[in-house]
């Protein structure tokens, strides 16, 4: 199974190693047991922002990097338009290749993925609600 994980939760790259938010990494260990390949579609952080992280303990085949964005001010709303458009295209291309689509909600990126997944009626999908959403 080709698993695609779409999330606003970042992959953190430190010293050439990939990390995830620690509880998220434990959850993904379960998914990794049932997937032949795992692809992430999410933001990538290149520095430690004091998030509780753990090294990824399974093979990640690829990461489609998405730009983080928020809509908390007028200027951010204007900036979000091109970011969202590019994200929609990247999410669509990633979904085309996947056998199973896993949305990790809430978040702006998962919201976009919810819209795109409508086009893939025959693909298996799951959604995980992982906490509060503060756009």
PLM regions and their residue ranges:
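An aromatic- and histidine-rich active-site surface loop
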Residues: 84, 100-121, 127-135
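A short, histidine- and acid-enriched strand-loop-helix "catalytic/donor-clamping" loop
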Residues: 10-15, 71-75, 128-135
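Generic beta-sheet signal
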Residues: 6, 41, 66, 128-130
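N-terminal subdomain of nucleotide-sugar transferases
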Residues: 1-52
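Conserved nucleotide-sugar donor-binding subdomain of glycosyltransferases
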Residues: 11-12, 77-100
